[in-house]
């Protein structure tokens, strides 16, 4: 898996240490520190994915500092200041590039989020704290390849995908589609797949349902073809793993009694 790393350094310094107290509560530390960030972008895809040159260009990334779900600061990577003063407390650092969509054929979304607790320094010398964020694609790559012989028996055929991110909607791969799609998935998510066909001979329709486990940065290629005539006419499925790409190829043969 190819990787592209980038970083911008982060220093946590100490400002004035302040304390507040009451008769009912212990003193809570407060103060102001200077932070910087260390971000790692792991944009390599475990499949024959789209051109990743855009995702390796650091100037395309956005960096945010978040506290209690509120975005305090947003920077383009090229405009990121060398240091940032913040109050002591809990924060999130988020870096991302692309549009966060449930499915896309044009792009993929890359994101990293890290929680950090900022504490003020009590010494004369500034303490150094590094906040590391790793950005990765949140999607899996899927492709469907229909055999040329499908058109000899079926007037229409397509594959429907259902994921958690899609909600009540679905993504349909038509018989004329060729470009891969990038589906937003959770780790080890069970993705529902339905193969639908319409016979030329009598216009009857048939469907078969499958489930495949997918995770971000993985690939799935589904090859659909008519099955050679046999006595049972059952659907058979074979799984082949290409270790050079980690693409999972699912060969789905249409049963004899569908033709």
Q: Which residues make up each language-model segment?
A:
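Alpha-helical interaction segments
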Residues: 11, 81-82
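Sec-dependent bacterial lipoprotein signal peptides
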Residues: 1-19
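Extracytoplasmic cysteine-anchoring/structural motifs
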Residues: 21-76, 83-259
